[in-house]
Structures are given as structure tokens and as C-alpha cells.
């Protein structure tokens, strides 16, 4: 299933060879290169118009060649585009197709969200500290 904006996050508290990957997990099932792919084998994968997107964070261990889900919470659905980032201990996000952006705290509790009207989707929303 689809994802958007994967970020590598190194953490000095982790053992050597470990790091985090976090992403806006669109959770949209489409494979244009394999049009006959059977997405029914993957329960809860969204279609273009509806589904559930997620903030997903994985702990990667290169020494053992494994990964595990470290944190996940649902976001407003968007089959395409969208973004998440880590900033100041919080998680700003944008969900392009739902025309929503906002911020969650580190535990996945919504702080504030905004909706906008537009003919097109926002590709990304980034927050900066000046």
C-alpha cells in the first residue's frame, strides 16, 4: 500500500545500527505496474476515495535485518500526497485529499487541525521554527 514522505530519524540513545523511519502512510492500494494485483489479500487497505491513513513510525535494526512498528495513529485519509514531520516534540501533518493540516503531540493526541477549500490538493505542509 502507498506511503508518502518517509523520513529517517537517528537517535543517539539507540544501539549502533538502529534508527527510526516515520511516514505518512496513505494506506492506499494501487499498483499501476501490476493492474491485476489482488488487494483483497491486504485487509483494510483504502481505495482512492476512502480509507484510513496513518502516521507510522518503525524501529529498524540493520544488524538483525528486522523492523517493528514503534508507533501508529490514524490521520485524515488521503490516498495520495500528504506529509508528516517531527518538530519540537510534536508531529505536524498535512492530508492532501482531505484538505486538512494540523499538529499532533508526541503521543498522537490532536492539538489543532485546519481545513481549507481548494480545487487542488496540498502536496505538503511544513512547519518551521524561526
Kindly label every feature range from the protein language model.
Residues 1-130:
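Histidine-/acidic-rich catalytic cores in large beta-rich domains
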Amino acid at each position: 500500500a502507498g506511503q508518502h514522505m518517509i523520513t529517517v530519524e537517528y537517535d543517539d540513545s539507540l544501539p549502533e545500527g538502529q534508527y527510526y523511519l516515520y511516514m505518512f502512510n496513505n494506506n492506499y492500494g494501487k499498483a499501476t505496474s501490476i493492474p491485476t494485483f489482488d488487494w483483497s489479500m491486504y485487509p483494510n487497505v483504502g481505495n482512492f476515495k476512502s480509507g484510513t491513513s496513518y502516521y507510522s513510525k518503525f524501529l529498524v535494526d540493520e544488524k538483525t535485518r528486522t523492523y517493528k512498528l514503534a508507533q501508529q495513529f490514524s490521520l485524515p485519509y488521503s490516498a495520495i500526497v500528504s506529509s508528516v514531520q517531527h518538530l519540537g516534540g510534536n508531529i505536524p501533518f498535512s492530508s492532501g485529499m482531505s484538505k486538512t493540516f494540523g499538529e499532533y503531540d508526541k503521543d498522537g493526541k490532536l492539538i489543532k487541525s485546519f481545513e481549507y477549500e481548494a480545487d487542488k490538493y496540498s502536496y505538503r505542509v511544513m512547519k518551521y521554527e524561526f
